Amino acid sequence: MKKSIIALVIAGLPLAASAEVILYGQIKSSVTVGQVKIKGDAGSETSSTATSINDNTSRIGFKGSENLGGDLKTIWQVEQKTDITGGSQGFANRDSFIGLQGKFGKVRAGKLSNMLNEMDTIDPWMYKTNAAGLGIFTRTGNRNAAVRYDSPDFGGFKFNVSYAPRDNRNPSDKYTHTKAAKDQYTGGVSFSKNGFTANAAYGHYNGAYTDNSGKVKAAQIAKVETYYDKDNLFVGGGVHYAKGHETANKYLSYFTDGFNKYKGIDITDDIADPVKSEAVKVVDAAVTVGYKLGNVTPRITYAHGWPAKGVNSGEKLVDKFDQVVVGGQYTFSKRTGINAQLAYLKVGNKTRLTAANKGGVEQKAASVGLYHKF
């Protein structure tokens, strides 16, 4: 404990020595109550009502810059999760980088989000279970050891590209290259003017799945998000396509929140149901509307997902889903507020639960959380 305190004091010394170093972060926690129900040909399985205290992406970071002359400067950032429920976290496990910025834009290297990971503006909710927010819509973005270029602003238009190298993605294979490459390419464009913003991104994730001929193929992800945020009104929507990003079993697990047993069989297990170990292609869409009334901002989100079909077989493995989240935010100040929501999510009854049963999944959730940003 004493060593930890000393380390924090030493780490804080540069903050007093340089005005270019900024300490920032947020603390967010919520209480969630939820229940999952699996209904199939052989009857229903209903979970107990679960109540949990959650950390909701609490973080702390340091960032700064140094003017190198002219318009050129060094930029850097070190950011990490700080799980206030006591979960073990590392250092620099969020966006952390060093780079250069100038009239040409900026180039960074480190642990970086691709643009897909940044397209979550229409998801304002605090949640742990996917029923209570747009966890399905935001699932394909990631953060990797990568290099990224962001263009300057051309009258509201910007673009970016990022690359996560093979040997960072496959570190155990970096000197032999006997395994399929898993490097990732991502690119995106955005336009913003007078409160309106439109974002579009494409991700090409190598080494994601195997086709019928045994060839290893890349996951292909495309996403569009647009929103209007001005004069107290927020209206936003998005469409998301993912091919080969996950298996049917993995995709189904997003809806069960860990309650996976139906008649004693794990409905998300590849061994229990190898048919659903096939990669799937999925399309989902979402829309969020909110309006600020003084300190209160009521919101509603609706999401719909079309059936997930096998990339090789074309078979419907997970049925369509529909989701509604209703709630809002109350702000005590610019930095502190409360979020609360009620949510309902339903996966259609044509989902392959097991080899012998089809059915669907329902999930209900309620959550209330407090946040503070600094």
Set out the residue ranges of the language-model regions.
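Outer-membrane beta-barrel proteins
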Residues: 1-374
